[in-house]
From Swiss-Prot:
It comes from Anaeromyxobacter dehalogenans (strain 2CP-C). It is found in: Cytoplasm. Its cofactor is Mg(2+); [4Fe-4S] cluster. GO terms for cellular component: cytoplasm. CDD domains: TtcA-like. This is tRNA-cytidine(32) 2-sulfurtransferase.
């Protein structure tokens, strides 16, 4: 029980700080919490329910689970849990599984197509239900892995933003767990004995690139525990004058009347091995350390 309280306090603090730093929740919001049956979404729902009890503003939560027609998906497991919480919920059924099987060649990972179809269903449901925000359970490790995946395989410096507006302009997506470490989320979900539904019921091949990046981060973290925190910290501490983005350089030059590259300090890359710092960085910063 003591472990549960310790983990809950830590996760509540991280979630509250992310909500405050990025203005994720507003007075009167009706937030759809996408609950897949995994550790991340269960934890997110629990934390938002706890924060709502003590928040200085009023907002509503509605949990939504989507049965995509995967063979053996135990929708009753998720529904029983949601019912036990007393939270308003809605169970959706859309057969996107057959669509994915038709579109994706055998042996290829189905996750990207499946994710896009699921997102479309949730977006439409949010509008129908009058929800102002959609909360997803992506945590710190997801953001850091995505940063490396984008840089290594797509040649772009980007990750998952803490909030965004959908392309059709109808929905705002928020990620309140963006400061929370996966290890803390996993430990909390296990301690709470959430009824986890496996995510591989469809038989999909895993995202091998993401698994490789996850292994790389695990190896680096074993040598230097602050690696993941430092990478998240880097997402909130961009130094444009030390990058090669010409469009960004032009925008800064037009705004300031100065050449950012000529104003850059002459710094050599140093392998100091020191953490960037702990705690929360304000003004859209990120948490350093673990």
């Amino acid at each position: 029980m003591q472990q549960i309280h310790r983990l809950e306090r830590k996760l509540l603090r991280a979630t509250a700080e992310a909500i405050r730093d990025f203005d994720l929740v507003s007075q009167g919001d009706r937030i759809m919490v996408a609950v897949s049956g995994g550790k991340d979404s269960y934890t997110l729902l629990h934390l938002l329910m706890r924060l709502r009890e003590r928040a200085p503003i009023d907002f509503d939560l509605v949990a939504v689970n989507l049965d995509q027609g995967q063979p053996g998906f135990p929708a009753h497991v998720v529904e029983d849990h949601l019912r036990s919480l007393g939270v308003p919920y809605r169970m959706l059924q859309r057969d996107t599984y057959s669509v994915v099987r038709r579109l994706v060649p055998e042996g290829k990972t189905t996750c990207p197509v499946c994710s896009r179809l699921r997102r479309g269903v949730l977006y439409n449901a949010a509008v129908e239900m009058g929800c102002t925000k959609i909360a997803l359970g992506h945590h710190r490790d997801d953001l850091v892995e995505t940063l490396l995946l984008s840089a290594l395989y797509s040649g772009a410096l980007k990750s998952m933003p803490p909030k965004l507006r959908s392309r059709d302009g109808r929905n705002v997506v928020i990620r309140p767990l963006c400061y929370a470490a996966e290890e803390d989320v996993a430990a909390f979900a296990e301690a709470m004995r959430f009824p986890i539904v496996p995510c591989d019921l469809c038989g999909s091949q895993p995202n091998l690139r993401r698994k490789r990046v996850k292994r790389l981060l695990a190896e680096l973290s074993a040598e230097h525990p602050a690696v993941k925190g430092n990478l998240l910290h880097a997402l909130g501490h961009v130094v444009p004058s030390h990058l090669l983005d010409r469009d960004l350089h032009r925008q800064l030059a037009d705004a300031t009347g100065r050449d950012p590259w000529l104003d850059a300090e002459d710094e050599e890359a140093e392998d100091c091995g020191e953490p960037a710092g702990d705690g929360v960085v304000s003004l859209g910063g990120a948490r350093g350390g673990r």
